[in-house]
Amino acid sequence: FNTDNSTMMAVFFDEATSADGSLEAVKEIRSIAGEQCFVSGMSSVVEDIKDLTMQEAPMYVVIAVILTSIILALTMDSFLIPLFFMLSVGMAIVYNMGTNFIQGEISFITEALAAVLQLAVTIDYSIFLWHSYKEEKEKHPGDNKEAMAVAIGKTITSVVSSSITTVAGFLALCFMSYELGMDMGIVMAKGVVIGVICCITVLPSMILVFD
């Protein structure tokens, strides 16, 4: 479509609006046309949102970690224990992100939100273990390992039942008509399971080493 000194071209993609092929085509069009061309439409909007989201994703995580650490430092009886909590949850997040290869590729929305959501959902497990450990230390003075062993047993009993309901809630997302639901559901359900495992393995080890 031509008018005066401007030309408008309509481009139709064979794939869906947010498909990888469509987004790659938008990138290619922009690289060929340069700054003299303005690309609009849903595919270009999705591509812009994807780029912006991936740029800001690390900032989301940093803000979440800082705010959570401040709250824990103010409410816990130790300023050091929040660091152990963050290290434990951080390892769980890394394991969760690393095991996403089984799905081939995950949505950029899931990738941007998964870390923050996993931190918010699983940090409670660490708090429960810590308080249980403190109670058992009073019952087993001078024997931290025995106190931690009992605390882990109590934590497993309470946390597993709680995590099952959380996992079930995330798996319910898999029944959404949008693929994002299944994507987010699987990643977050897996993240909760890994979070529980790290809570009863990694965190107790760190606490015993530094206590």
PLM-predicted stretches and their roles:
Residues 17-211:
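Membrane-embedded transmembrane helical bundles of large multi-pass transporters/channels
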